[in-house]
């Protein structure tokens, strides 16, 4: 039954959002996201377009004996602090139900705030990791280094690495709690005291990467998948080889896997998109 629902939902998304309302769509299992771009002065028109689209989807689902769950429907504005200050639309009405536009939403376990600083998500992530480390500390004396390292990788490192590519471009102040988690986990594995230096141990003994290199590694993996067509289309479209551009003269650099970079923009949100971030990955990394 869930498979049938997904097929019908995918057909509905393709029929209405793309053709009639020009809304972008991201869908994972039964979790669907609609997004679109607009200026702050046009927020009322944008809300009307989204509401009309959802109303048509609801009518189609009702005719096919499905139900749209308005209780789980959430809305959020994304932008800079200056842009958000110009937005005066804070509610949306669906089928007579007024839904407040939130300042934070959760998508696949990641808390997204309006300015995409991910401060709330990092705070929640670090709290859960420290809780797991406290639990492991209580049984540390009964474990050897290998077993402790395995448990840390399972309960802590897996949380740190989950969706960490979204932290690219986030300020060092927000990433500091994650690095603290890595440091505490390393001290637990090698049984060092709280204020002992741990940087060289992380690098030489445990072979762990610091948080900023973990982010760079994840971006390189995404770019590699995009170039080999094993990533979603909305990501692959952001990564193009210089040699694939039509009408461009072919040089020897075509074989060097240089990627097309868009025009530099000083907006912080734009600089964090994959089209700009893949410039941090050298062609030597991508060939590995």
Language-model segments: which ranges?
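Hydrophobic/basic alpha-helical segments
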Residues: 1-288
């Amino acid at each position: 039954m869930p498979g049938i629902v997904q097929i019908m939902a995918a057909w509905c998304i393709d029929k209405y959002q793309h053709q009639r309302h020009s809304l972008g769509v991201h869908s994972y299992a039964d979790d669907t996201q609609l997004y679109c771009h607009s200026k702050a002065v046009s927020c009322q028109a944008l809300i009307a377009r989204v509401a009309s689209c959802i109303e048509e989807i609801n009518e189609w689902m009702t005719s096919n004996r499905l139900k749209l769950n308005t209780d789980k429907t959430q809305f959020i504005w994304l932008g800079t602090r200056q842009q958000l200050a110009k937005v005066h639309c804070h509610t949306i009405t669906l089928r007579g139900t007024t839904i407040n536009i939130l300042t934070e939403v959760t998508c696949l376990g990641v808390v997204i705030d309006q300015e995409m600083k991910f401060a709330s998500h990092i705070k929640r992530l670090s709290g859960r990791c420290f809780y797991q480390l406290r639990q492991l500390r209580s049984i540390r004396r009964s474990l050897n280094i290998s077993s402790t390292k395995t448990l840390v990788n399972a309960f802590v490192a897996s949380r740190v690495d989950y969706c960490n590519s979204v932290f690219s471009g986030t300020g060092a102040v927000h990433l500091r709690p994650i690095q603290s988690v890595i440091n505490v986990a390393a001290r637990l594995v090698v049984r060092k005291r709280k204020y002992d230096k741990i940087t060289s141990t992380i690098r030489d003994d445990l072979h762990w990467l610091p948080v900023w290199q973990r982010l760079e590694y994840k971006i390189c993996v995404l770019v590699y998948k995009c170039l080999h067509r094993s990533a979603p289309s909305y990501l692959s479209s952001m990564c193009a080889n210089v040699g694939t551009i039509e009408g461009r003269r072919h040089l020897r650099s075509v074989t060097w896997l240089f990627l097309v970079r868009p025009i530099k923009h000083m907006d912080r949100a734009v600089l964090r998109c994959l089209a700009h971030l893949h410039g941090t990955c050298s062609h030597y990394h991508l060939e590995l």
